[in-house]
Amino acid sequence: MPLEHRNMLVSALREAGLNAIDAGNFMRANLASFDMSWWRQQAPFILNNKRDFIAANIASWKALWSRGFAQAAEQRIKQSRYYQLYAEAGYDFLRPLEQKGVPLWRREEQFMVLGSDRPIPKLAEKLPWVRLSQRAFVTGTNEMNWRMFTRFVDKMYKVNERIAMGKITGKQAADWNMKRSIDSFARMIGDLTGRGELGPLKAISPGLNAGFFSLRTNLGRILTPRHLFAADPYTRKEAWKNLLAFVGGVTGVMLLGEQLGLWDVEKDPRNSDFMKIRAGGKRFDPWGGYQQYVTVISRLTTGEGVSATTGQEYPIQPFQTAGR
């Protein structure tokens, strides 16, 4: 095949592949435009950081109706005292508001379709509910994450001062490493809020995302437990505080509601409805994407699943279950 024809074929195949990816991401952006899905991303932090969550909701609501407010909120973060630290260290828990020219893997997965010059992304840009929802999503998550990050860095500077003044001594002072603590906490924010580190998987992220598989979110969910055993004691403490509040608070509300007869709660981890609220034929999952991994592990370890409709046990195929 002549080189010119070969290049034309490669270009056509590439364009067809991009159109398929764009179509999937277009559908996803529309689905994400009619709920408060950024709450799901922040779920592990909400109960232990209620003031930050309230402030983030206010910012998100204002950004929904005002592009100018959303842009100002982003600029306020970029002009704050710790943003240079954030940028130079290469942290990535903040989502870009304007996505044009931003690599696909850095964009918010729910709205990855925005920011390109191809036909489908251009159409998405013209849909007001997609644009408004993307602004609200990005502003809400960024506001909450930045508040938590700056408060932690402030705390680390205070620890550093106390060590310098001799108020903290012994092993705690000997093991002190401020950069390690901040790096570790930034990674924790990323993992727990759906910004898992992709590494060599960056190239395939857009394609998987088009198939409704959020690679960064799922990697973050899978990596979350590592922070409970982090080498840095300050990050480890924050991980335990936030995850205990998350699991304990959500479980308590669910079981209380069940006792009051408001809803039913499935307690068999082999069931896909495990620890979901069931009321009036509807299901509500407050776990932000974590529950499914408990179910998968339970099914893989027991070799059995339980039907969410009939309650009957059935044998499972390991590869099929892991794929779900």
Where do the protein language model's features map onto the residues?
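Amphipathic interfacial helices
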Residues: 3-324
